[in-house]
Amino acid sequence: MKLITAIVKPFTLDDVKTSLEDAGVLGMTVSEIQGYGRQKGHTEVYRGAEYSVDFVPKVRIEVVVDDSIVDKVVDSIVRAARTGKIGDGKVWVSPVDTIVRVRTGERGHDAL
């Protein structure tokens, strides 16, 4: 099993969610976050004054999937989140040793 973590622009979330459902993902965790990479920050104007905003709003999506669909899920996220502009985000894959469904006590693949 693998944990797939994606950091994407907030306005792409609906497209990514639909794409993940089409890829067979049954559930996900979504968190609103802030950060910066090469994009750095941006400037905004408020009441005529320009302000530098160091952190950019992003969305973190986390899904645990079976090894057999990892590439399909990663490709689905990338396709749905790509705008071609700087700041589109990142996707990474981490190993998951075990998973337990709290309600039933099921473990491993049965808990997915």
Curated annotation (Swiss-Prot):
Pfam families: P-II. One of its GO terms (cellular component) is cytosol. SMART domains: P-II. GO terms for molecular function: ADP binding; ATP binding; enzyme regulator activity. The keyword Transcription applies. The modification O-UMP-tyrosine is found at residue 51. In nitrogen-limiting conditions, when the ratio of Gln to 2-ketoglutarate decreases, P-II is uridylylated to P-II-UMP. P-II-UMP allows the deadenylation of glutamine synthetase (GS), thus activating the enzyme. Conversely, in nitrogen excess P-II is deuridylated and promotes the adenylation of GS. P-II indirectly controls the transcription of the GS gene (glnA). P-II prevents NR-II-catalyzed conversion of NR-I to NR-I-phosphate, the transcriptional activator of glnA. When P-II is uridylylated to P-II-UMP, these events are reversed. Belongs to the P(II) protein family. Homotrimer. This is Nitrogen regulatory protein P-II. The gene is glnB.
